[in-house]
């Protein structure tokens, strides 16, 4: 079968068609990159500023940290995760950054300056000082299905955590996200453990 040669007009139309296809593919790629960027920022780039010393030495006053809001949509918080929690039902309620110590269904007790989970001592890797004030955990606090027990890292100088009766246990709906990165100051840039 013999090919019929294309006229100049047909060649030009073919060239324009190929150019439009290349531009379309390029624009589609650009849109995908933008969508992924928005997804990443909305999921992993939510920032909050630390306004006290309650998480010292892990986090310090005026550290800017990033939250991962997506991690708990596909999984559950784990012991020792550092999380941002909203204390109260209102959108205007204060947000705190705390460390998860107790998980749903466990009993948390603080006695003789140490944390016990279901009668087994929990080693606190962020501070080895004895806890001076057990608060509501002195007699043991059994957590419900969606409840977590949170603690300040600087627990002897701050008590605005689950030991305080007015705060108590944290419901999973109050957890805004996992704190994963110190963004600034640059001298403290790094992952949060």
What are these regions (language model features)?
Residues 22-42:
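Hydrophobic membrane-insertion alpha-helices, especially the h-region
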Residues 25-32, 48-52, 142-147:
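Short, functional N-terminal and low-complexity linear motifs
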């Amino acid at each position: 079968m013999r090919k019929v040669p294309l006229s100049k007009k047909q060649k030009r139309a073919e060239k324009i068609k190929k150019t439009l296809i290349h531009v379309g593919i390029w624009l589609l790629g650009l849109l995908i990159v933008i969508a992924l960027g928005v997804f990443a920022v909305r999921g992993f780039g939510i920032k909050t500023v630390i306004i006290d010393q309650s998480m010292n030495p892990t986090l310090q006053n005026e550290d800017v940290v990033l939250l991962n809001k997506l991690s708990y949509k596909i999984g559950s918080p784990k012991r020792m995760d550092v999380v941002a929690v909203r204390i109260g039902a209102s959108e205007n309620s204060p947000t705190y950054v705390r460390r998860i110590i107790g998980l749903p269904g466990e009993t948390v007790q603080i006695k003789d300056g140490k944390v016990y989970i279901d009668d087994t001592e929990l080693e606190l890797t962020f501070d080895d000082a004895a806890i001076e004030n057990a608060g509501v955990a002195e007699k043991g606090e059994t957590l419900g299905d969606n409840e977590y027990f949170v603690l300040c890292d600087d627990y002897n100088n701050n008590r605005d955590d689950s030991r305080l009766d007015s705060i108590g246990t944290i419901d999973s709906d109050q957890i805004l996200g996992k704190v994963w990165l110190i963004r600034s100051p640059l001298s403290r840039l790094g992952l949060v453990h």
